[in-house]
Amino acid sequence: MHQRALLFSALAVAANAQQVGTQTPETHPPLTWQKCTAAGSCSQQSGSVVIDANWRWLHSTKDTTNCYTGNTWNTELCPDNESCAQNCALDGADYAGTYGVTTSGSELKLSFVTGANVGSRLYLMQDDETYQHFNLLNHEFTFDVDVSNLPCGLNGALYFVAMDADGGMSKYPSNKAGAKYGTGYCDSQCPRDLKFINGMANVEGWEPSSSDKNAGVGGHGSCCPEMDIWEANSISTAVTPHPCDDVSQTMCSGDACGGTYSESRYAGTCDPDGCDFNPFRMGNESFYGPGKIVDTKSKMTVVTQFITADGTDSGALSEIKRLYVQNGKVIANSVSNVAGVSGNSITSDFCTAQKKAFGDEDIFAKHGGLSGMGKALSEMVLIMSIWDDHHSSMMWLDSTYPTDADPSKPGVARGTCEHGAGDPENVESQHPDASVTFSNIKFGPIGSTYEG
């Protein structure tokens, strides 16, 4: 995900590290959600959302000079990582006007293209300075989503990562912006497109993208476990745990980061592939999509349960279960139709069998597998985003992938989208009005957040 260049008329306060500007007040859009104790017994929580720091206007602490424009840094203000952090400030956001982000009660709508801005990434806040932390173990997480306006190549994602609740302020005193300004992001790709990591800029080694006018790849990445509850559009969906060797955020260097942004995908300390359950990829082509069993033309409720071996909030993660509720009917997740792979939930046995059946390298097991994922689930931050994919055009989600593989081979077909349909150039020009709407977030013990 990438910051988009903004222009404001501003003066900023000077200080001595990753700074905060004063031109646009930072007002987090309110978003309510519910904490449940038993079925039908839920209490409303008053939260808010904050946009990631990577999208924000970054300018000189002394005036309105951009520190970053398009996909390049200002070399005078940012000759190195430390100087850049001292010289540059993040400013507040116009959520609706600049980023196409609006809230109403429990509803969050993310628009795809707004002016020059493409996509967004938002975090749920506990208060103005702190991300909301969740312990997913022995709990379920439920939300409503409308994906009807998400065509091929787009991803309206809801997921968790093991970010610091304060955005890294206490660990890295040079970070003066913190969670209030959306700092501290990490995930299992160890993303190197972040402009700041651990309170320092990522300008050293920065290479502007050849395909994305707003993004680039820096010398460092930010790694942490990632639980993808929902990566989806109107064609395909996947739920995917991604463990890492460390349960909290760490910084990596260069191609040793692995993941999407590096020469060697599996060189890092995280699992960039995960163990995914995509109904189409698992052989059921009539389960999810327009007019299918889970009909993406209508809003749906998505329930994800994190079962522990001993039924406690600190037990070992043993299973991730998915079900849906639509039009008052509970719909069990589709069952695998792949030879040698059984079940309709994510377990250690499922993941081992799936990797074998698809001929995929088992990086999931290498980095701890399901139990490793479970160790990170006690302190997770909720993320909601909309994005397109400059690396592989989202074909890993909704098309056949790898592109040169036999589509009849197990695991290659992931959805009905044609090659090229999801190219960012196409979706940004043909579907700028695409959007995703999340609402009615509920969290509580198993069985407490839905009826049916």
From Swiss-Prot:
Residues the record marks as carrying a glycan: 81, 284
Subcellular location(s) per record: Secreted
Annotated active site: 226 (nucleophile), 231 (proton donor)
EC top class named in words: hydrolase
A GO cellular-component term linked to this record: extracellular region
BP terms from Gene Ontology: cellulose catabolic process; glucan catabolic process
Enzyme Commission number, as recorded: 3.2.1.91
Record-linked InterPro entries: ConA-like_dom_sf, Glyco_hydro_7, Glyco_hydro_7_sf
Region entry Disordered, spans: 405-431
Catalytic function, reaction form: Hydrolysis of (1->4)-beta-D-glucosidic linkages in cellulose and cellotetraose, releasing cellobiose from the non-reducing ends of the chains
UniProt GO molecular function: cellulose 1,4-beta-cellobiosidase activity
Keywords tagged on the record: Carbohydrate metabolism, Cellulose degradation, Glycoprotein, Glycosidase, Hydrolase, Polysaccharide degradation, Secreted, Signal
Statement: the UniProt record of this protein carries the keyword Nucleotide-binding: no
Position of the signal peptide: 1-17
Disulfide bonds: none
Function: The biological conversion of cellulose to glucose generally requires three types of hydrolytic enzymes: (1) Endoglucanases which cut internal beta-1,4-glucosidic bonds; (2) Exocellobiohydrolases that cut the disaccharide cellobiose from the non-reducing end of the cellulose polymer chain; (3) Beta-1,4-glucosidases which hydrolyze the cellobiose and other short cello-oligosaccharides to glucose.
Similarity field: Belongs to the glycosyl hydrolase 7 (cellulase C) family.
Name assigned to this protein: Probable 1,4-beta-D-glucan cellobiohydrolase A
Organism listed in the record: Aspergillus fumigatus (strain ATCC MYA-4609 / CBS 101355 / FGSC A1100 / Af293)
This protein's encoding gene: cbhA
